[in-house]
Amino acid sequence: MKITAKAWAKTNLHLGVGPAHDDGFHELMTVFQTIDLFDTVTLTTLDEELVEEGSVVKQLSVTGARGVPEDASNLAWRAVDALVKRRAEKTPLSAVSLHISKGIPVAGGMAGGSADAAATLRAVDAWIGPFGEDTLLEVAAELGSDVPFCLLGGTMRGTGRGEQLVDMLTRGKLHWVVAAMAHGLSTPEVFKKHDELNPESHMDISDLSAALLTGNTAEVGQWLHNDLTSAALSLRPELRSVLQEGIRSGAHAGIVSGSGPTTVFLCESEHKAQDVKEALIDAGQVYAAYTATGPAASTADQRGAHILTVS
């Protein structure tokens, strides 16, 4: 059996970072949105090999990006193991291989690893499920703070560690430019720097919520915010000039996506987004740039991680 699932990249229209709890995680107030960059995960059963104990994953390969782990530390591999453990029946299973095709910038603050985990959960559910949406979301939250959102997609408010999700009403599509850097940033490193700098927390999203309801791109751009910006700029000062170039070339607003170093720029139209993308590339400050729209997908069954093919 071969199952391919797809999951979208995410960006944060707002990321407010509160104090750290005893477990080291910070209280967050965030607004997630999927954008139509994506990864796919293909799970293939190796029917000639049955596994009675230990991981059923025997191989993991990655194309489209360098530096992604191809071992049990990969979040997709861990997603298989975590969901397999939830089976009621403990009979032997076929071994499986995983292949990840990357279209989301790696270590860029766009939840590429979390998207892979979410797509993998959908694939395993199609293989040996159904487990039910509640179980999938529970396992997703165990795997990482962004995985539940990647499973569900759309535009959502996230609180707690980002895993407590509520749908948000939006109007129309937003046009984005995604500017990727050659080297990623470690999320724990960014949060550590944030704690050192200790900037003011911004936990109020009421103005952004109202702007999203209008569908007015300029209004939405006015309320984009990320509390991790100062930390990301401290670790990667060159991001400041990337943000300046995006605004100079016509974007309404630009912010660091998540923990960075990817930056995203909100534009008035697809045409303007193309202009901003070309200006960023011509300036020679970014590794790659893409245009995208959000929220991704036009149908409800494709708004989050979803199955593409089963054969």
Curated annotation (Swiss-Prot):
Catalytic activity: 4-CDP-2-C-methyl-D-erythritol + ATP = 4-CDP-2-C-methyl-D-erythritol 2-phosphate + ADP + H(+)
Binding site for ATP: 105-115
Coiled-coil regions, chain positions: none
Root EC class: transferase
Molecular function via GO: 4-(cytidine 5'-diphospho)-2-C-methyl-D-erythritol kinase activity; ATP binding
EC assignment: 2.7.1.148
Keywords: ATP-binding, Isoprene biosynthesis, Kinase, Nucleotide-binding, Transferase
UniProt-listed Gene3D superfamilies: 3.30.230.10, GHMP kinase, C-terminal domain
Main function: Catalyzes the phosphorylation of the position 2 hydroxy group of 4-diphosphocytidyl-2C-methyl-D-erythritol.
PANTHER family: 4-DIPHOSPHOCYTIDYL-2-C-METHYL-D-ERYTHRITOL KINASE, CHLOROPLASTIC (PTHR43527:SF2)
Protein name per Swiss-Prot or TrEMBL: 4-diphosphocytidyl-2-C-methyl-D-erythritol kinase
Organism of derivation: Corynebacterium glutamicum (strain ATCC 13032 / DSM 20300 / JCM 1318 / BCRC 11384 / CCUG 27702 / LMG 3730 / NBRC 12168 / NCIMB 10025 / NRRL B-2784 / 534)
Higher taxonomy: Bacteria, Bacillati, Actinomycetota, Actinomycetes, Mycobacteriales
